[in-house]
């Protein structure tokens, strides 16, 4: 290990100016370090693993971006803030567990971590939102079980996670934003009854989906939401959302709805095939 342990009892912040003495292949951040500032270890390809102190509270923007050989981290239990792109382009990182104190995963936090195959959340997670492109192009992810506290999955959060074939959504989830699961490998989809917004292209080109049921509280269905899902046979909508965008499915698919409903009229106007529910 490189230099570790506290040099004094006084807490301090690691920056680009004072990080040199701790930089090494297997890093152990001092126990009295409470924060790592932006870009502190940016593009430091020498780093293979990092041990953070339990009580560290903040990791800044791009703090470890581009650490191409970093394969092992254990995020601190007391972490309350993670900066934009903190671990993006860490192409060797294999495993991440999101600690309980983190309420938001910011933009591009783990973007392009191509070997990330194991993503877990603390059993007592307080996570509310996953930010834009947070896990985009994490091409080794196969399964994600989201925590019960989660309410929003933002734009492109899991964009082009091509091997992601299984997700489990919590009952409190309200928003799935634009291109959130664009071009993912999902084999099936069970959306939460709490869901209110399915935004534009949310599941665009998820080519393994065959049958999807829209939950009753969804009030907004954005355009192209299931467009490009070439194996999709049926989209079932049993209620009338406030808004329905254009080309929500391919022409080859069929929408199942009630005769005379707003969805029925939408199908007549757009030329989509319809099958009536009884």
Language-model features: locations:
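Structural signature of tandem-repeat unit edges
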Residues: 1-13, 20-35, 45-58, 68-81, ...
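Residue-level signal for alpha-helix termini/capping positions
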Residues: 41-42, 249
